[in-house]
């Protein structure tokens, strides 16, 4: 199980500060949310990958589709994933839309902002991710209580499944994800990138208490 610091990629100076802050908070990964970069030119994120690695952090590159919570659909999305792949980073793409895995280590993800997935949907999508050879499968969903959340979690057939409950008042469920064995656990070091997101420091404390860092 790993702690991931999700960083909106806006201003380079701010991104640098948040990477350093993520390392100090005990994160294992930083997620660079490139869809926050609202310029037409490709963001200069390769130097940020190098900086993160200098601080002992692995890197996830995400250009989230607007239909699943992204800021916008940039013209350089494909190019950014190619660059991330060449740099050896993890790439996060939507399981419902991908045609081929953009990186050797790819996360196939799905997001439900209005209501939880139908029964069996997580099983179907996780099976697709597994058969595609995805490094991990991620589900972010609105949820109201622990029993329904546990049922959704238990549907996944992918051995590396990350679950993120979303919505107001789900902070405790976020921390409980580690108890269920969520492979990746996302937190913030500044601006939250998802509703209900807790801080990375809270996550690392929870994971350390469980003695469950790593695979």
Swiss-Prot record:
| Residues where 3-dehydroquinate binds | 6, 31-33, 64, 174, 193, 197
Q: How does it assemble?
A: Homodimer.
Q: Which organism is it from?
A: Ignicoccus hospitalis (strain KIN4/I / DSM 18386 / JCM 14125)
What name goes with this protein?
3-dehydroquinate dehydratase
Q: Which residues form the active site?
A: 111 (proton donor/acceptor), 138 (schiff-base intermediate with substrate)
Biological function: Involved in the third step of the chorismate pathway, which leads to the biosynthesis of aromatic amino acids. Catalyzes the cis-dehydration of 3-dehydroquinate (DHQ) and introduces the first double bond of the aromatic ring to yield 3-dehydroshikimate.
Keyword Amino-acid biosynthesis listed? The answer is yes
State the reactions this protein catalyses.
3-dehydroquinate = 3-dehydroshikimate + H2O
Q: Which CDD domains match?
A: DHQase_I
Question: Which family does the similarity line name?
Answer: Belongs to the type-I 3-dehydroquinase family.
């Amino acid at each position: 199980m790993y702690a991931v610091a999700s960083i909106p990629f806006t201003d380079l100076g701010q991104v640098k500060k948040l990477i350093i802050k993520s390392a100090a908070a005990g994160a294992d990964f930083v997620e660079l949310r490139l869809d926050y970069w609202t310029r037409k030119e490709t963001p200069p994120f390769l130097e940020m990958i190098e900086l993160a690695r200098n601080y002992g952090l692995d890197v996830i590159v995400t250009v989230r589709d607007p239909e699943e919570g992204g800021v916008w659909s940039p013209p350089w999305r494909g190019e950014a994933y190619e660059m991330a792949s060449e740099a050896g980073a993890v790439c996060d793409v939507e399981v419902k839309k991908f045609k081929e895995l953009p990186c050797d280590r790819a996360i196939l993800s799905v997001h439900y902002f209005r209501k939880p997935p139908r029964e069996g949907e997580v099983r179907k999508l996780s099976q697709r991710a597994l058969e595609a050879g995805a490094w991990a499968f991620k589900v972010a969903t609105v949820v109201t209580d622990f029993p329904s959340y546990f049922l959704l979690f238990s549907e996944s057939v992918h051995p590396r499944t990350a679950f993120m409950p979303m919505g107001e008042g789900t902070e405790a469920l976020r921390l409980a994800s580690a108890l269920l064995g969520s492979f990746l656990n996302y937190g913030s070091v500044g601006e939250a990138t998802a509703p209900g997101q807790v801080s990375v420091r809270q996550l690392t404390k929870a994971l350390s208490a469980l003695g469950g860092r790593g695979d």
